[in-house]
Regions:
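Glycine-rich, often proline-containing surface loops adjacent to acidic residues and nearby aromatics
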Residues: 100-107
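Beta-propeller and closely related beta-sheet repeat lectin domains
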Residues: 22-24, 86-96
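Beta-propeller domains
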Residues: 1-17, 27-88, 108-143
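Structural WD40 beta-propeller signal
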Residues: 29, 98-100
């Protein structure tokens, strides 16, 4: 068995793409594409489908190979609500994505109440999936 005994960062292989958001959990799918999810951001202003809308979670596809790769806005991913008042904010945060066969699974979590209030913490979870590599998304029970 081969063991990993260390890693090193190669700065010349890092490509900063300028997206607005954080976390960027990523998975490699059967169609040889990468899929990544952002939290707390608007995405990429130069990508088709960009609206400037703030998302707690949004999934993108990554096409091509570095340094000539690009991001794709997945129109089938639901625009999860994000309101202007605390009670309507912070609904679902995407904290993990994985590809298995021709499906994508995305883990979402939700807080007990808005973060403006003391004692806020993540208490709930939800699993959504795409049976067709990002074209459509369903709840874990198969409902839209």
């Amino acid at each position: 068995m081969t063991r990993i005994v260390g890693i090193r960062t190669l700065d010349e292989t890092i490509h900063r793409m300028g997206g607005i958001g954080d976390n960027w959990y990523t998975t490699w799918a059967a169609n040889d594409r990468l899929y990544t999810s952002l939290t707390d951001g608007t995405g990429f202003p130069d990508v088709e489908g960009y609206t400037g809308m703030f998302h707690n979670t949004r999934v993108f596809a990554i096409n091509g190979n570095p340094p000539h790769h690009s991001f794709e806005y997945l129109h089938g991913f639901p625009d999860l609500p994000f309101g202007d008042v605390p009670e309507e904010k912070y609904r679902y945060y995407g904290f993990g994505i994985i590809a298995l066969d021709d499906r994508l699974y995305h883990f979402l979590t939700t807080p007990n109440h808005p973060f403006e209030y003391e004692g806020s913490r993540f208490v709930g979870c939800k699993l959504v999936y795409s049976p067709d590599l990002g074209e459509t998304w369903l709840n874990q029970d198969g409902s839209p």
